[in-house]
Amino acid sequence: MVKLLGQLLEEAYPNFVEKNLSYDLQSNVPVKIITADGNLLARLFDNLIGNAIKYGADGKRVLVKILAQEDVVTVSITNYGYVIPPEELPLIFNKFYRVEQSRSSSTGGTGLGLAIAKEIVDMHGGTINVTSDLDGTVFTVKLQVNFDINKENFGTIS
């Protein structure tokens, strides 16, 4: 998990530079292996990191934290830019939903990224939550370390 997130952050480095952002990856362990579909998790975290960059404030940072426990890994991605209004938080994982103030041509997007992210987390038996206030917007993903990957869990991502 640490390696995957580190690689995704490195790949996104040009985007960080373009937005005048920095990033910080923190983990309580140097390595954590979980049973999961690596391609889907890469898609999930690439989306969350991309959104943190897109909506991050110029000159601020994106903080990625990994908290590994015996049977659960928690990943939080925080940006210190745009605050999502509280009334919009319950809707943010709906397909085609875009936060009203982010619907500009400069940010782009279809409103599918977070819906797909939630489907990926659900397929892995995990949870995804968001909080947003003046202290930052935080997406928190919790995944089981030893998830039973079988065909019933993995369907088509719509």
Task: Mark where each language-model region is.
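Short beta-strand/loop element within the Bergerat-fold HATPase_c
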Residues: 59-71
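Short helix-loop "hinge" at the ATP-lid/N-box region of the Bergerat-fold HATPase_c
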Residues: 52-53
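A conserved beta-strand-to-alpha-helix junction within the catalytic ATP-binding
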Residues: 1-10, 24
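Conserved catalytic submotifs in the C-terminal HATPase_c
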Residues: 22-32
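Short alpha-helical Gxxx[C/S/T] motif in the catalytic ATP-binding
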Residues: 108, 113, 117
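Short conserved segment of the HATPase_c
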Residues: 84-96, 155
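Conserved glycine-rich
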Residues: 125-126
